[in-house]
């Protein structure tokens, strides 16, 4: 069975807001956002730019990462986009199985 790789991405709007999403094809999804066929949250937001994208693997992990990143402050998202290592740390924290407690 073919495994599909999911990506997490952040889009920057004209007013400098960051939108977080997941997809299996970043180029296609970004084009959908640019042409008004993507998320309603980005429609009418002016010029869009792809600020960040990274492969995360399976869909379940991509959904977890998307949720966690959407919980971050704008400053924390900006650091992630700048490549401060926070994406890698978050990725690793979600890869580690939970500790079983007695």
Curated annotation (Swiss-Prot):
Signal peptide: none annotated. Belongs to the UPF0213 family. Coiled coil: none annotated. PROSITE patterns: GIY_YIG (PS50164). Residues 4-79 form the GIY-YIG domain. SUPFAM superfamilies: GIY-YIG endonuclease. CDD domains: GIY-YIG_UPF0213. Pfam families: GIY-YIG. It comes from the Bacteria. This is UPF0213 protein Ent638_3592. Gene3D superfamilies: GIY-YIG endonuclease.
């Amino acid at each position: 069975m073919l495994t599909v790789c999911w990506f997490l991405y952040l889009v920057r709007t004209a007013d400098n807001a960051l939108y977080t999403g997941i997809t299996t094809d970043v180029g296609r999804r970004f084009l959908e956002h640019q042409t008004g066929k993507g998320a309603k949250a980005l429609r009418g937001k002016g010029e869009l730019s792809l600020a960040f994208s990274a492969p995360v693997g399976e869909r379940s992990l991509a959904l977890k990462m998307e949720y966690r990143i959407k919980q971050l402050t704008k400053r924390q998202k900006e650091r992630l986009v700048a490549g401060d290592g926070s994406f890698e740390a978050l990725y690793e924290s979600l890869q580690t199985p939970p500790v079983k407690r007695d």
